[in-house]
């Protein structure tokens, strides 16, 4: 019996002289690995459909083992992302984040749509940092360690000023001071709350000042390191690229 799925390539591993083991995050099955024979060869029928963050339709035998890809059809390769090295670095981080956060063959349509929406938004030119923090929040929710963004962790108060505490796992009000907290503007606190509740499309035109951008990166980097348990190579590459970009400016 053959299975037909819509999937996004989240990881590839070379196998032998010409083959690839391709890991797809699919709408129907969750994460699944398949063998794409000959995919390393530029002229092969599976070469295009086995590239990172390609979205396509894939057909392979139903099997608990490593199934062999029989047919594939590329829906989109997100060409605008591929034209820009920095955007590619963001996309690769999201792929590894999803890959490392989900188990094999556990369906998660909401997360598939989030990854799909993120790639579409990046391809359309949306702010990569806004998308990244949206994806990170959703992954933290999936892992069961999302920060409390509805009010003060201690008392539920929503009165400004609001602080963010990595140690306490979310917002803190001025009545519950703590060392190492990050002071948030009213706008940033509201943005974080809204990002935890709404679709990505709602934030398509959100402007970020340089100061806010640095603050959010600091906040999410510290929180992800403390709570996600993930140490990702693609995140280190992205951070190096961001630092290089800042030095050039």
From Swiss-Prot:
Q: Which InterPro entries match?
A: ARFGAP/RecO (IPR037278), DNA_rep/recomb_RecO_N (IPR022572), NA-bd_OB-fold (IPR012340), RecO (IPR003717), RecO_C (IPR042242)
Q: Which UniProt keywords apply?
A: DNA damage, DNA recombination, DNA repair
Has keyword DNA repair? yes
Protein origin, superkingdom: Bacteria
Biological process GO annotation list? DNA recombination; double-strand break repair
Q: Name one GO cellular component term.
A: bacterial nucleoid
Q: Which Gene3D superfamilies match?
A: Nucleic acid-binding proteins (2.40.50.140), Recombination protein O, C-terminal domain (1.20.1440.120)
Query: Which Pfam family, any one of them, does this sequence belong to?
Result: RecO_C
Family as reported in the entry's similarity comment: Belongs to the RecO family.
Which PANTHER family did the record assign? Answer: DNA REPAIR PROTEIN RECO
NCBIfam families registered for this protein in UniProt: reco
Task: Give the function comment from the record.
Answer: Involved in DNA repair and RecF pathway recombination.
UniProt name for this protein: DNA repair protein RecO
Recorded source organism is Exiguobacterium sp. (strain ATCC BAA-1283 / AT1b)
């Amino acid at each position: 019996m053959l299975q037909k799925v819509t999937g996004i390539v989240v990881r590839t591993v070379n196998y032998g002289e010409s083959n690839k083991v391709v890991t797809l995050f699919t709408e129907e099955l969750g994460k699944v690995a398949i063998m794409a024979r000959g995919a390393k060869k530029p002229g092969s029928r599976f070469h295009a459909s086995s590239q990172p963050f390609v979205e396509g339709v894939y057909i392979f035998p139903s099997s608990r083992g490593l199934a062999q890809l029989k047919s594939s059809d590329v829906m989109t390769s997100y060409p605008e992302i591929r034209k820009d090295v920095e955007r590619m670095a963001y996309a690769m981080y999201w792929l590894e984040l999803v890959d490392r956060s989900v188990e094999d063959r556990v369906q998660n349509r909401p997360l598939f749509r989030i990854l799909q929406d993120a790639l579409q938004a990046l391809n359309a030119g949306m702010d990569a940092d806004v998308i990244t923090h949206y994806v990170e929040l959703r992954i933290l929710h999936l892992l069961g360690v999302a920060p409390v963004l509805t009010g003060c962790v201690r008392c539920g108060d929503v009165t400004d000023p609001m602080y963010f505490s990595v140690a306490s796992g979310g917002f803190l009000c001025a009545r519950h001071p703590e060392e190492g907290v990050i002071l948030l503007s009213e706008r940033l606190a509201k943005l974080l709350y809204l990002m935890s509740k709404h679709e990505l499309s709602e934030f398509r035109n959100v402007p970020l000042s340089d100061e806010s951008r640095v603050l959010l990166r600091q906040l999410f980097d510290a929180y992800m390191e403390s709570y996600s348990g993930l140490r990702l190579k693609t995140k280190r590459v992205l951070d190096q690229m961001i630092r290089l970009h800042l030095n050039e400016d």
